[in-house]
Amino acid sequence: GDVYKRQTQLRALVRASAFGRIKIMVPLVTCVDELRSVKAMVADIMKELDAEGIAYNKNLEIGIMMETPAACMMADVLAKEAAFFSIGTNDLTGYTMAVDRGNSKVAYLYSAFNPAVLRAIKRIIECGKKEGIMVGMCGEAAADPKLIPLLLAFGLDEFSVSATSVLKTRKTIADSSMAECKALADKVMAC
């Protein structure tokens, strides 16, 4: 059931890569074997397509949506095998803080500014940078003008934000001094 569905979806993505630049991002990763499994499936699909004479991008990138505390803790290992990371801040925050932001009794605990979440984000970026892979971010935090200076100081490569946040995010980035961002990050991370 699930394996067949996953193989069908992956085959469609690999075939679509012949017509434009796409990347495959594996969600909810908790261990390196999950990434290896997807990479093995894609390699098998590529062999099938070669045998069938069907075109595809032979340099298709496979990365990870970094959104679980387990992925954060394994970021150094995962970065050696992933083509890129995208930090999913909404889920990473919720899972790290063990809260459902929709639950009014604990929603006050949901914050990307929590030191545990900031440390998780910083660790993911550092591990990605060490291995030379691109690290992006999606979720509400990527567009937060108060958080952007920290993300710049940590070395985030790419901000994925909603269309309504693009201009404000670009302005915040353009107006940021890296020296000030790093000073702020040093102060915040010392807490």
Language-model regions: role of each:
Residues 1-4:
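Short, small-residue-biased leader/transition segments that mark boundaries at the very start
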Residues 22-26, 62-66, 85-87, 135-139, ...:
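Hydrophobic faces of well-ordered beta-strands that scaffold small-molecule active sites
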